A protein has these predicted regions:
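Nucleotide/pyrophosphate-binding catalytic subdomain
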Residues: 1-194
Length: 194
């Protein structure tokens, strides 16, 4: 929905290696769309089903401490050219403080986190939602992590429907990324599982 809103407002988006480059304008949109529009719509769906949910971002209560992701070398598999890319206001999770989440859950509330976090200086970052989910699952010592996606699954060969896999060992996930067979938004999903 961030891409959709950016298009409506004429804000040009750039994605490199499945990760969004978050410039100043895109960060402002991310705050509006993730914490506002998307989070509120999800909360409304839970309410409709009688579930008491509370909307948060990683900034709230210091749930998530992040740091700016440093520029990194990215290979463009179509051209074979490697370039150093600065993803802008994209952050990496440094620490999860799950105490607020635990208090909410222990009192019958379902926390719904949007994918924003901040550093100790209050700088806000756009963080991949799958990465946040994995980090929170670890902090909560969750038995399972279920990631939802708008794609039908992981395929060894995206052109072959019969190559869909239901279980993926960590070593195989790494190979899919390193070989370039995993592309776009599937890369951060696999990285969050590794």
């Amino acid at each position: 929905q961030l891409t959709e809103m950016a298009e409506k407002l004429g804000v040009i988006q750039k994605v490199v290696g499945g990760r969004r480059v978050t410039d100043d304008e895109t960060l402002e949109l991310a705050k509006m769309v993730f914490r506002g529009k998307i989070n509120t719509e999800i909360l409304a769906q839970f309410r409709r089903r009688g579930i008491k949910a509370v909307g948060l971002s990683g900034v709230d209560g210091g749930v998530l401490t992040a740091e700016r992701r440093p520029p990194k070398s990215v290979l463009d598999r179509t051209t074979g050219v490697t370039d150093v890319v600065d993803l802008g206001h994209v952050g990496d999770v440094v620490k999860i403080d799950a105490s607020l989440i635990e208090v909410m859950m222990n009192n019958g509330y379902l926390p719904v986190l949007s994918s924003l976090g901040a550093d100790d200086h209050g700088q806000i970052f756009n963080i991949n939602a799958d990465t946040i989910a994995a980090e929170i699952a670890v902090a909560l010592k969750a038995e399972k992590l279920i990631l939802l996606s708008d794609v039908n699954g992981i395929y060894l060969d995206p052109a072959d429907a019969a190559s869909k896999i239901s279980r993926l060992p960590i070593a195989e996930a790494r190979k899919l990324i390193e070989s370039g067979r995993a592309t776009g938004g599937m890369i951060p999903k696999l990285e969050s599982l590794i």
